[in-house]
Amino acid sequence: MSKTKKIQDNKDYIKSIKALLNNYQDGWDVFINAKNARTWDYPVLLKDGVAPNADLPNTWVGLVEKVCGIIAKEKYDLDTYKNTIEIITAEQMLDAYTSVGLPVNYEHWSFAKKRMQHEQEYKRTRNLAFEIVINSDPAIAYCMESNSPMMQILVIAHASFGHNNFFRDNYMFKQYTDAADIVPLSRDLRDLIYECEKRFGRKEVEQLLDSCHALQTHSISEPEFVKKETPAGKIEDRDIFSGVNLQDNFNRIANKPGQPIDCGQEQNLLKYIAENAPHLPEWKRKIMDMMGEVATYFHPQRQTQVMNEG
């Protein structure tokens, strides 16, 4: 029997949902009643005699997450991280845009610039995302407080289970990222930058961050499964451009005698410079190394945007 056929025939999830909702005074109507009341903050009340416990959500949003989780797991057999759902304001969503959803981040002028750009765009259009979710463990979803109850159900299913499953199961996210590590890494990086600003001065740190930002898209640590010898017969980019006359200055510099450098297979420029630059102070090496890890974390998100929205 195909997996699709098994999904179509599987009705056990309905029994699980019934068993869950049977503990509440509104029962199955709890979602329709919230729609009619036009609020996702609709009260969910347990029936008399039902003792509160961790398996019975005490908020409407929590109950939506629980029901969606039953459908995701029992009907579609989706593997996901645990969820954290936060209901946020428009101002908080603009902040999330600026930090790409990360709950902690260091300070830099470029983030303030992005924040102003997003705010101006919002004032013109009054449009913001219904949700943002980040690849972390637990997965953190930010849902707009202006969402209607039905939209809240949709975005929780979409973000907290659709995107969540993609983050957990897609091979690029498995190979390039550690979902449990990104929030602690971001916190450690923020704290390190703050301490360095106090010890070495904001200007010195800012100049380093400017350089790191310029190299971020060229700082991807390739996993072992792609670090392979070039197959015989495969055309490299440099072969395509062989014979092209380059500028004299470039040729003169490129052909200048010097000590050969063994780059190995390291493709993360930030990490390579941090490890090999001869006169770099240790605090700069540490920041560059951590920035290289953050850059690698965002790589699969750029590569899978269409597929992730599936």
Description of each model-found segment:
Residues 13-23, 27-30, 63-66, 70, ...:
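Charge-rich, solvent-exposed alpha-helical interaction surfaces
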Residues 24-45, 210-310:
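Pan-zinc metallopeptidase signature
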Residues 138-155, 298-306:
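Short pre-active-site segment immediately N-terminal to the catalytic Zn-binding motif
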Residues 155, 159-164:
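Catalytic glutamate of the conserved HExxH
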Residues 164-231, 310:
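Post-HExxH zinc-binding segment in Zn-dependent metallohydrolases
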